[in-house]
């Protein structure tokens, strides 16, 4: 059997466009002699559709898209498998199903419905879908093919020490005589995820002694980035075919001969994270209808990284920087911002906020009489910069990219309606220590566009004289180590202090900052997820609450 993996980048809700995309890939697969092409989970609707499935008519249009794809591929000498939103035959509960259809010669040969609906991290499928109760083997000549949808293959009872569900759908199908697994996925990227998929499917191949096919969606949809990285394994767990990472691909593998297309790119995890941010930015803009971006260039490392990512995502002609010096901005920061912009080949305007700041201070002076200057005056500067960027955004129709990193956002070292203003938080899931690593990646791609001084200068918001981040925060190496354990692994403060050999009071202080700044994060622009636990849709904490583990 020659199997093609249609690693496509669908757009959520664009049913006609997604059908056309699958039809185009199907024709290309037929030209390469494939007997079968397999597309990812919910390809025809895009993943995740979220509450779109609640809209009247959406399920019917999704099912009509299946019929349309069957019609458009009817004359092709191959079978097509694609994911879609179907309607449940059960009279109670949710009406939508996460399903897959097997198409041949214009007809639907079989349908399969996802049984295990994930409700962790960025997944909330039980909110919208009803699970399937049974599954069927696809009889294809002498072959018994197991077709599963994402999570149904992610509950191997021997691979995981604590499976999330009582059922193991793959094992059930293998016990019924399956000799091949086709797993269609919308599996998001995060650090280490590509290797985890390989290890998990290899364990299943070893256990069942059967070939494994894993096809994955590629592209960015809101906060989630899908890397593709599809693959085919033989019964020994050897990868015999693999798709590219972070781009569409058509991969053909011959199960009988054990040969297929092999691609291996972005093998370094830092390169992979950088490329995920580029893809996430590009797709967010493209799918939302934007073509140009605005970035506040401070001369610091965060805005520098955001700028090089933006240039890779949409091209230098569509990136516009704005330097906004204030009363405490250093001359070297303004020079560094313009030097980088010139090397990148992007436009950079200078709009001083000092006159507006001075006027604002004068305006508020009668009301502030008798008080000392504090963080209020610092935040006025940040909010004037936000106002400037949003005004330019309105005037020129460009999307503002915020430049805050995960470390700052975690502890609230950011200003609501100030530096948090924007439409997409590109590096909001990137810890500060990783910002430097990714900036080296971007700098290499752009021939040293980021001045070395930007890497070497102490981080500073420059909102008061001689200010440094270290005045308010622990060293970023220490802060990021605490945040990784507290935010991503949900570890307790005493456990963290012991493991990192840090003072308990320091860890408590960081944890309290994280907990008390939830209100800021819930008003932030959507951010691109690249770690195992990002702020956003995958981390849901109450704002009005009094459970502080550090007390």
What are the residue ranges of the model-derived segments?
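Enzyme catalytic cores with a strong preference for nitrogen-chemistry domains
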Residues: 1-296, 312-313, 323, 348
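ATP/NTP-dependent adenylation/nucleotidyl-transfer catalytic domains that generate, transfer
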Residues: 2, 209, 235, 261-299, ...
